[in-house]
């Protein structure tokens, strides 16, 4: 039986996105796109092979990056990765 939005918890979304591509929007018109390696209850997230995007322009690639949770606006699993 498919889950409905009403019974989906935020941490479940992150758990299901582990080892998958995600897009993270953060304060300051920045985004990070990469493979979700880990997270905690404070929304601190670790990405592998992460691209930093500022104002729509790719500014660099990181092997591994930690994004501090208090800067996170949203986390979105990439299309096709939302099972």
Curated annotation (Swiss-Prot):
SMART domains recorded:
Sm
A single GO BP term for this record reads:
mRNA splicing, via spliceosome
Q: Give Gene Ontology CC terms.
A: ribonucleoprotein complex; Sm-like protein family complex
Q: Which domain of life is it from?
A: Archaea
Keyword terms of this UniProt record: Ribonucleoprotein
The record ties this protein, via InterPro entries, to: Lsm6/sSmF (IPR016487), LSM_dom_sf (IPR010920), Sm (IPR047575), Sm_dom_euk/arc (IPR001163), snRNP_Sm-like_arc (IPR022901)
- MF terms per GO, please? RNA binding
Family membership, please give it: Belongs to the snRNP Sm proteins family.
Q: Name the chain's protein.
A: Putative snRNP Sm-like protein
What are the leading ranks of the lineage? Archaea, Methanobacteriati, Thermoplasmatota, Thermoplasmata, Thermoplasmatales
